[in-house]
Amino acid sequence: MAKIVEVHPGIYEIFLPLPMRPTIINVYLIDCHGAWTLVDTGMNSPESIKALEEALAEVSIKIEDLDAIVATHHHIDHFGASGEIRRRSHAVTHIHRLEAERAGRMIEFGKMAPHDRPESRAFFARHGFPIEQFSPTGMRPAWMGTSMYGPVTQPDKYIDDHDVIKIGDRELEVIWTPGHSPGHNVIYLRKEKVMIVGDHLLPKITPHVGIYPDAAGTNPLGDFIASQLKVQKFDVELVLPAHGGVYHDHRHRANQLIEHHRYREAEMLDLTRRSPQTAFEIASQVFGGEERPIFHVMAATFETLAHLELACFEGRARRSERGEQTVFQAL
């Protein structure tokens, strides 16, 4: 498979390898006619950097020729190589302030296991997660705390909703789409009717939306659904996702994602009609239990919690206390 494909005049999709599923991330190179912009970076692995170098060579440029980096969000596959790329190119780096803060926290978290943080231990216990039954080594992804995550933590420019980044003769409009991550943005090229959507509008899979120990009391799934409605207001002819193939009907896909989460929420609430349950108890029934890798069990619990909190926000469920645990029940 070619590492780079021109998907629209002057806009290139680059395929970079990942050591986990999904196994490929699509990043996007934009020829701004006098400047080159990279939207998302891949992770900071030798394999990914080499693939990026080979892709750029196909259009006769090098990493050192990049003028700007624009990140949809801080996750390793989207922003992990930003530090190395900026070091080599001096590219002006753009990211939402919330994402830059989270990138810094991820580096700090990489120096310790999740169960070493008192606030995390209390959060796990409150939501029924039997932390003592799992090996601490499995409680975080293998890349955390390694050089594969080398993000810029002090970007050159913070971006926010409605900002327009002018690079060369292109205008990149920032649309804030919180949900998958609090500072997630999609990038809209209005003249071209092209939307680079990061993980917000994936064509085949649903992006993870969860509540984590550092985000207790938030409603990310509510934000995600609102963001799906928000992007439908824009005139788009070509959708460029971070995983999966390019496609055209962003409104149809946005509605599919909303319907999926509404169905999943109803499935979870049905399990609580006879008696209230913790997020972990519900997740074990919906996604499978402790035979799965611990990191997957954690993610499933946090995703379940996001659905339950949305139901509480919207008046379809209530939370209560069962000893020292928080439990949920459908109304």
Description of each model-found segment:
Residues L52, F224, T304:
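Aromatic/hydrophobic pocket-lining residues that form the small-molecule binding cavity
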Residues G10, I30, D40, H73, ...:
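Divalent metal-coordination and catalytic microenvironments
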Residues M43-I49, A57-V164, K193, H248:
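Active-site HxH/HxHxD metal-binding segment of metal-dependent hydrolases
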Residues A266-L331:
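C-terminal regulatory/interaction regions
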Residues W36, M43-E47, T137-K157, V164-K166, ...:
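Metallo-beta-lactamase
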Residues I24, R102-M106, I205-P207:
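Short, charged, surface-exposed secondary-structure boundary motifs
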Residues A2-I61, D65, E108, I187-H200:
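Conserved beta-strand hairpin/beta-sheet module of binuclear metal-dependent hydrolase folds
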